[in-house]
Amino acid sequence: MAQFPLAERAVAALGIVVWPMIEFEADDAIATAAARADLDPDVEQVVICSPDKDMAQCVRGTRVICLDRVRKKLYDEAGVREKFGVLPSSIPDWLALVGDDADGYPGLARWGAKSAAAVLAHYEHLEAIPDNPAQWAVAVRGAAALAETLRNGRDEVILYRTLARLRTDAPLAESIPDLEWRGADREVLEPLCNELGATGLLERVHQWAVVESERPGSSQG
């Protein structure tokens, strides 16, 4: 926790917009920014650079996609469906059933990735899944046991879904143009690197932001 302020200083010095969050998670900020950019006609495509499963719910067609930098793979809507077996809109329901260790909720017993995908591919959301497995329109192995677990755990699985759903109303003040990277801030980054004894990092900066006084045609008075 003590390193968070330092991390914010370092990121800001690199010229990257920082979004401090209160009552929101970092993923909520990313989801909010992606949703806003999706509505902006000047934005050609939104790429979310995260391998986190919950970010898949933000994917929209081929316009809003996810990049797994470790596996070097892009996921559009078809890719999400291929990977998880459900549409992006069903990802929170899928995570609620399966669980997500990264976010600290266990999912429901007996439910696995394949069974959750098979059921949600048809019903899409938890509320639409009948309590009686005889009424299920899909054939799933162990349906009776799965239905019993779901029936007895409706309240908790709805809570898990609430935790899995990303918010798109985070208070981000910046507009899309404000987010454009213009280079690192030399006046801030150089003293910070000196303070940390990491001056070698300065050699890796390939673009410095132009301060107003250095812009062509600018005047000081």
Where in this protein do the model-derived segments appear?
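Extended two-metal-dependent nuclease catalytic cores across DNA- and RNA-processing enzymes
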Residues: 1-173
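Low-complexity, acidic/Ser/Thr- and charged residue-rich accessory regions of DNA metabolism proteins
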Residues: 152-153, 157, 162-221
